[in-house]
Amino acid sequence: MARYKDSTCRLCRREGTKLFLKGDRCYSDKCAVARRSYPPGQHGQGRKKVSEYGLQLREKQKVRRIYGILERQFRNYFEKAERQKGVTGENLLILLERRLDNVVYRLGFADSRAEARTLVRHGHFLVNGRKVNIPSYLVRPGDTISVREKSKASPKFKEIAEAAAHRNVPAWLKADSSTLEGHVLALPTREQIDTPAQEHLIVELYSR
């Protein structure tokens, strides 16, 4: 699948907020947004009046980039959210949170969603005891996500286990860093999703 190849820090600066695309670096003084809180490029520091459509588009791009999803797939998630009962914008965020790569990241088993996506693709994770190497796989309440026994012995996952012990996990998940195993306790509520999103703007954009 095609992916954005330019600097991920430029994406954060373009959106004017931290997208947490580079793991621990995003929490440090090295974060590009902390050092240069204006868009990249020659005219980045110039002030522009943004139209209503521009605000909606930027919000969609921001959320899409946070979860590392291309436009067609993001549109598919929106259409699925629209068909579900409830608030479309909230349904959209819940679907994105249920992605296996996001859950691996939320459990603390990867520094970033991009790293989680790579680890899932390489077959390091099991869902209910079966290998799943599809990052977009949607987890359900009651699912158990674990690291393959063979992978646990690698230096990489020993580092992950050590780091995971100090990471906060959202209330809808439960993680055990000693066994590198996590459980989906429930679907997340909107209040439990800390993604900096104004999802109503995305709904307005796609409703045009």
Swiss-Prot record:
Part of the 30S ribosomal subunit. Contacts protein S5. The interaction surface between S4 and S5 is involved in control of translational fidelity. Transmembrane segments: none annotated. Keywords: Ribonucleoprotein, Ribosomal protein, RNA-binding, rRNA-binding. One of the primary rRNA binding proteins, it binds directly to 16S rRNA where it nucleates assembly of the body of the 30S subunit. Pfam families: Ribosomal_S4 (PF00163), S4 (PF01479). One of its GO terms (cellular component) is small ribosomal subunit. This is Small ribosomal subunit protein uS4. NCBIfam families: PRK05327.1, rpsD_bact. Residues 98-164 form the S4 RNA-binding domain. Belongs to the universal ribosomal protein uS4 family. GO terms for biological process: ribosomal small subunit biogenesis; translation. GO terms for molecular function: rRNA binding; structural constituent of ribosome. InterPro entries: Ribosomal_uS4, Ribosomal_uS4_bac-type, Ribosomal_uS4_CS, Ribosomal_uS4_N, S4_RNA-bd, S4_RNA-bd_sf. The gene is rpsD.
